[in-house]
Amino acid sequence: MNLPQNIRYRRYQDWTEEEIKSIKTNVALSPWHTTYHIEPKTGLLNDPNGFSYFNGKFNLFYQNWPFGAAHGLKSWIHTESEDLVHFKETGTVLYPDTSHDSHGAYSGSAYEIGDQLFLFYTGNVRDENWVRHPLQIGAFMDKKGNIQKFTDVLIKQPNDVTEHFRDPQIFNYKGQFYAIVGAQSLDKKGFIKLYKAVDNDIKNWQEVGNLDFGGSKSEYMIECPNLVFINEQPVLIYSPQGLSKSELDYHNIYPNTYKVCQSFDTEKPALVDASEIQNLDFGFECYATQAFNAPDGRVYAVSWIGLPDIDYPSDSYDYQGALSLVKELSLKHGKLYQYPVEAVRSLRSEKEAVTYKPETNNTYELELTFDSSSVNELLLFADNKGNGLAITVDTKMGTILIDRSKAGEQYALEFGSQRSCSIQAKETVVNIFVDKSIFEIFINKGEKVFTGRVFPNDKQTGIVIKSGKPSGNYYELKY
């Protein structure tokens, strides 16, 4: 949604109680509110931030502008969970209220240090000529949720980057704290800078150099870089803006991607023997994925189910965006697998055999098996007129096609209404999670993933098996 600059950057304290009440009333009217996904109470949700473990709980923040479905003066909202499924929102913790983040508390990461959670984020500052000055800054959050912002800038804007320098991720590698930051060079090329904490002092960062990860020459910006280690093998997850489609087949405005690497050379610095760039998700909406190595030895990730610069049907209700289910990451035969955490099964009600359902609550999971050498088509969000989200699983040719051209209110049509990927031509297992206006589809327990939104009318709640004979179960999901 396009709103004037003076509205988007209006100070929080200048919004009246009456205006805020009006926004809340409008949000409440939406027919598309999710049940088991995180979405904003009001306004815009975008990047997940600060995904971490602290004080005996998982902590997950998200970017928010609470006054409408637009990218305005950003703050951080905090949520916490014991099982990575049931999240409790505790409120706004980082406001754009200092000289170092006056025009937005932008994205970042978090790490437990002692009895506090270190928040490492980008402060967005604009001068009187509206020139942006990005600052990498920090804060501590204590166990009661109190915030103490650092007075000094942790990483200033280097001389070799433009105003696009953001999204710091802190991580611990062999006992040493490092950070990577997404950047744009002066000749408008995307890259990543690596820093190390001198003597592991998180208030004293030293540049190591530009990280060599076999990046492209076509991307003009790297957003939201995340480096995690799966069985000690480095995996880089990032969002390259401007990537040439000759290098990667994608259809969204910007892709979310990854590379699997063999080792991490902290001296060069480099990610050694990086794989070819791969799509993290083949669906319509997945961006700014944030992942971290948890104390339990697992690697977890969560994504923004949305994209920059796109208008959504929910905008008219003064809100936009949601976060994906939390996914556990693993490597199999050099491929990245992502699959919802085990605790998602706790949402299941009694299982039913998959069959035609003229009506559902649009809050369910399907677990389906498709025989080899078969062609199958399902309709979800279906009405009695043949409309719905069409899912074709062709195990004969080895393809999956998702078509939302007849599913709910149409939007972002300039980027097409179909998405597809190749699969092995064999028996295929598919898990589909539907939540009012969200679908997440996992192929063969996370080998391929499709994430997207559908904004149905009140009659589009059915499930239809148009062709083929998939076997499996239907579970109503209750949060």
UniProtKB/Swiss-Prot annotation:
Xref: CDD domains: GH32_ScrB-like
Reaction(s) catalysed (UniProt annotation): Hydrolysis of terminal non-reducing beta-D-fructofuranoside residues in beta-D-fructofuranosides
Positions of the catalytic residues: D47
Oxidoreductase is among the record's keywords: no
Keyword Hydrolase: yes
Enzyme class: hydrolase
Similarity annotation: Belongs to the glycosyl hydrolase 32 family.
Name recorded for this polypeptide: Sucrose-6-phosphate hydrolase
UniProt gene name: scrB
